[in-house]
């Protein structure tokens, strides 16, 4: 399960759990994280060995689609369900 743990003006923090042992196709080597801008489909793809990441720099007040997948020596597994998040605006109006 992928969750948003924080958002800023130019960053998003994500956290997830490893796949269950019976769902793995070998030893997990790492994770692929993808964030796509909803309006333009521009995509950022990162890899990490950890189950959390902060992605930056992102565009302020922009809606992103986020997914994550584990990978092994066999290849990349299925991506998680899509979650959406929006970065914060550069300034707040009162």
Indicate residue ranges for each PLM-predicted region.
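Extracellular low-complexity, O-glycosylation-prone stalks/linkers
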Residues: 1-94
């Amino acid at each position: 399960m992928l969750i948003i743990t924080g958002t800023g003006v130019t960053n998003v923090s994500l956290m997830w759990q490893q796949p269950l042992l019976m769902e793995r196709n070998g030893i997990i080597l790492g994770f692929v994280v993808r964030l796509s801008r909803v309006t333009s489909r521009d995509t950022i793809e990162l890899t990490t060995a950890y189950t959390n990441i902060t992605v930056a720099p992102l565009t302020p007040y922009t809606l992103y689609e986020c997914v994550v997948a584990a990978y092994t020596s066999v290849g990349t597994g299925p991506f998680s369900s899509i979650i959406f998040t929006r970065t914060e605006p550069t300034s707040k109006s009162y």
